[in-house]
Amino acid sequence: MLIKKLLANSSQEIDKIIETNLEKYLEILCKWNKTRNLVSRNLSKVELAEHIFDCICLMPFLNNKSIIDIGTGAGLPGIIISIMDENKEVVLVEPNQKKISFLLHIQAEMGLKNLVIKKEKFENVVLNSEGVLVARAFTEPNKFIEILEQKNIENSEIIMMVSEEIKIISPNWRVVYTASEAEKVLEKKRGFLNISRIEN
């Protein structure tokens, strides 16, 4: 009931069924992570629950129905978004076969019909320009901006989850930091970089 405890200390209100599904995801993630090192094998169950809670706190910022999670790894935040809002179409982009196997298992085990899984590098994937791009632990922010520039990204909403406040000055991109509620609850630096193209 680790996620329930974290939610109790926050303003996040979610359905009991969704809460149960998040706990189920945590259990499966813990089991697989011990042998497959999906996130970091050294992370405790409590720390994995904190990662999930961090993703829960992203939800109020996602108004679009289409979400593209870049380099999703073990499904953070994409799986969490899929569990919490069945009306959103969530695309997970991940090149690693080991992690793809886990994502497919989660999708089948939890019946996530709103999930699309793509085994591709972000640099090669064809994207829906109307979807919100989200990234967490994908790469460092300046490198991310470089990749966005190379791909000529047209998405109007891009959110990068970060563990520190980062200031980026770019001639083509506006980057604004927003603190996450997870920062207060976890007592760790947590926030989002809201990235948008500057119209010339």
Model features per residue range: what roles?
Residues 1-64, 68, 98-115:
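Class I SAM-dependent transferase core
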Residues 29, 81, 195:
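Residue-level signal for inorganic ion chemistry
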Residues 56, 79, 142:
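Conserved active-site region of classical short-chain dehydrogenase/reductase
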Residues 63, 85, 153:
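Short conserved AdoMet
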Residues 70-72:
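Conserved beta-strand/loop positions that form the S-adenosyl-L-methionine
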Residues 74-87:
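Conserved SAM-binding loop of SAM-dependent methyltransferases across substrates and taxa
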Residues 88-91, 95-200:
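S-adenosylmethionine
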